[in-house]
């Protein structure tokens, strides 16, 4: 699988990985594969937050579960498990994606950044600071995904309008805040990032 992954920016999702299938050895399972082939472990190499990880995963393992269960990076949350809420948003090769829509094998050879990779030592990323300063969270469950989406926005658009911020957050749901403080948090971070 190539690290040049085609990302559908409208949904923050990726196309489903389709392994090569030996047509003489199919019995009608997943993608026509035998049960043994369906669950055969696949070696992958993924750089997460600047650290290379070599692992062996089942082809059906979602990136979110690889990050959480295999690497212990539990800052990436599983909210809806249906690609609706955005709580699982990470950066894959510099793009914000919902990691519940990406198979771990699709990330083979890729660069992944999670919420744990944003801080610089003891110093929070400006977006993390903004959420603290402007009270952009309540229960906090959506916060990692919101922050990862906001960081992606500010890296590509350093001075977004309120409407651009709201549009960028369309794939992220929050049941607590009403979004006003989230938008204010991102505006605060935008100003801080432009001044530094």
Where are these regions (language model features)?
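Signature of N-terminal electron-transfer/Fe-S-associated modules in redox systems
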Residues: 13, 17-196
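Acidic, Ala/Val/Gly-enriched low-complexity intrinsically disordered segments
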Residues: 1-8, 15, 20
């Amino acid at each position: 699988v190539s690290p040049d992954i085609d990302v559908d920016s409208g949904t923050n999702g990726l196309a489903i990985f389709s392994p090569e299938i030996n047509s003489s050895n199919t019995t009608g399972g997943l993608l026509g594969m035998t049960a043994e082939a369906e669950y055969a472990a696949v070696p992958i190499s993924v750089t997460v937050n600047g650290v290379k990880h070599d692992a062996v995963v089942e082809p059906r393992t979602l990136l979110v579960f690889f990050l959480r269960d295999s690497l212990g990076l539990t800052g990436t949350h599983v909210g809806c498990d249906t690609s609706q809420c955005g709580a699982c948003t990470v950066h894959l090769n510099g793009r914000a994606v919902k990691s519940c829509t990406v198979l771990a094998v699709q990330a083979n050879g890729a660069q992944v950044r999670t919420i744990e990779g944003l801080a610089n030592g003891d110093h929070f990323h400006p977006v993390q600071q903004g959420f603290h300063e402007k009270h952009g969270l309540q229960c906090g469950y959506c916060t990692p995904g919101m922050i990862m989406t906001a960081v992606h926005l500010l890296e590509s658009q350093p001075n977004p309008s309120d409407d651009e911020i709201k549009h960028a957050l369309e794939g992220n749901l929050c049941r607590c805040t009403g979004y006003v403080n989230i938008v204010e948090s991102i505006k605060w971070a935008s100003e801080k990032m432009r001044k530094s």
